[in-house]
Amino acid sequence: FIEEMWGVKLKIIDLAVSTIPSSYLLPGILSAFTCQIPDVYFHSWQSDSLGAVARVLDGSVDLALVGNTFDEPDCCFIPFCKDKLVIATPVNQHYLQYQQKMDSGTLDFSDFLREPFIMRETGSGTKKEIDRYLEKRNIPASSLHIVARMNDLEAIRKSVAGGLGISILSACSAKDLADTHQILMFPLNHESAMRTFYIVYSKNRILKPHVKQFLKFVEHYYK
């Protein structure tokens, strides 16, 4: 329809994008890419990381941007961006005391174990990175006081700001709320508290030249 309406043959790229790349990475990438290559049109679908990779495998999209890797021999996962995991908390006197402990260097992750946690759903890249972090610290997930599980990142952000509990988030998804003093943000100072985002393509498909061009652009965008 768009091709007929504009009367030109567009170069189309179909993307499947997981939650955090969709909201916090893709807008800047697309803006920068289309400044250089203006004759490309994008279709974007948002899902969790697992669902995005499934779309690559079934051929319904050209590429995926996700926050996790999977054991899929038919897919190639290329890292393009790293981000820190942080603990996001409500802004109140209780957590301001935690901030004082952090400033004095006496705060540890174990201090948060008794706090009410809001967790992401299985299938999300963030959830998998949280599981890895807990495993590295020898902390069983069952030891957390989980008060809610949600599959919507924005619902988690608002629930933290509203005082329901705390959550572990990617720093890029919490920064705007921290900057506007709606939440407090505590970095997880551990080597396993980093997460990587990947651009994914199928080894079984021949990528069109403009898709390859976008793939290379994303691969080097944050370097």
For each predicted feature, which ranges?
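Central regulatory/effector-binding core of bacterial HTH transcription factors
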Residues: 10-73
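Hydrophobic hinge/microswitch elements
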Residues: 48-53, 57-61, 66-67, 129-184
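A late-sequence structural motif
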Residues: 25, 184-223
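Short beta-strand->loop
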Residues: 76-86, 104, 145, 179-193
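Secondary-structure junction motif
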Residues: 96-99, 103-109, 115-138, 207-208, ...
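Alpha-helical linker/hinge and terminal dimerization helices associated
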Residues: 1-6, 214, 218
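Short, well-ordered beta-strand segments
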Residues: 12-16, 64, 88, 118, ...
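Immediate post-signal peptide segment of exported/extracytoplasmic ligand-binding proteins
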Residues: 3-13, 105, 111-115
